[in-house]
Amino acid sequence: WPVRSAAPSSSAFISANHFSSDDDSSSPRSISPSLASVFLHHTRGFSSNSVSPAHDMGLVPDLPPTVAAIKNPTSKIVYDEHNHERYPPGDPSKRAFAYFVLTGGRFVYASLMRLLILKFVLSMSASKDVLALASLEVDLSSIEPGTTVTVKWRGKPVFIRRRTEDDISLANSVDLGSLRDPQQDAERVKNPEWLVVIGVCTHLGCIPLPNAGDFGGWFCPCHGSHYDISGRIRKGPAPYNLEVPTYSFLEENKLLIG
């Protein structure tokens, strides 16, 4: 068998009609049909794989929606749910309306907050009627010694008694050990001449009668409690002495209660 060369020259694979050897340029070489078909197959495959569409050729590749939105951005569209229309951002008709609504809402909100704050502050300050009831000025110049006057303060009666020297001596001579609610007379008065007490019985809230009872002070007709000239309980069911309110002397003959 004749021996065939394992690797033919590259010039033989191209074509016998285009290339020839240096020794014999006039006689073309023949090529095997099987080798020519293999060479053409690989050449066509290489050419078809190497040629691909490029972006600069005007072809748009198929991209995912998110990538396409990033590479091809467009203006955002705002959907109007009320009119079922689409308006681009910053539409003049919608911008003016939104500005009016926001400004009006802020004004109304500020007005409501102002009213609430004023109402809260005014509610904390006392009215004139309350201030008038909180304190009471009493002129003492018309009260005679040994007499009692009754004034109204915070809806309660207040007894003001101008005591005589005998009244003062009698109040100081009482044995504290015999008292149900022991209290010295000096602890209950700021000026020995004047006794100021709230005219409400400490038993059940009745109003005692002045210049009555067994001890020359007050007597409660409801349940028979007796108070002395210093307003201390001496007899009866009342557990405590008559209450002494807060008071002060503005002048010699002017008293401020409260």
Curated annotation (Swiss-Prot):
This is Cytochrome b-c1 complex subunit Rieske-1, mitochondrial. The chain crosses the membrane at residues 96-118. [2Fe-2S] cluster binds at C201, H203, C220, H223. Residues 1-46 form a transit peptide. Disulfide bonds join C206-C222. PROSITE patterns: RIESKE. GO terms for cellular component: mitochondrial inner membrane; mitochondrion; respiratory chain complex III. Binds 1 [2Fe-2S] cluster per subunit. It catalyses: a quinol + 2 Fe(III)-[cytochrome c](out) = a quinone + 2 Fe(II)-[cytochrome c](out) + 2 H(+)(out). CDD domains: Rieske_cytochrome_bc1. Residues 119-258 are mitochondrial intermembrane. It is an enzyme of class 7 (translocase). Gene3D superfamilies: Rieske [2Fe-2S] iron-sulphur domain. It comes from the Eukaryota. Component of the ubiquinol-cytochrome c oxidoreductase (cytochrome b-c1 complex, complex III, CIII), a multisubunit enzyme composed of 3 respiratory subunits cytochrome b, cytochrome c1 and Rieske protein, 2 core protein subunits, and several low-molecular weight protein subunits. The complex exists as an obligatory dimer and forms supercomplexes (SCs) in the inner mitochondrial membrane with cytochrome c oxidase (complex IV, CIV). Its cofactor is [2Fe-2S] cluster. Belongs to the Rieske iron-sulfur protein family. One of its GO terms (biological process) is mitochondrial electron transport, ubiquinol to cytochrome c. GO terms for molecular function: 2 iron, 2 sulfur cluster binding; metal ion binding; oxidoreductase activity; ubiquinol-cytochrome-c reductase activity.
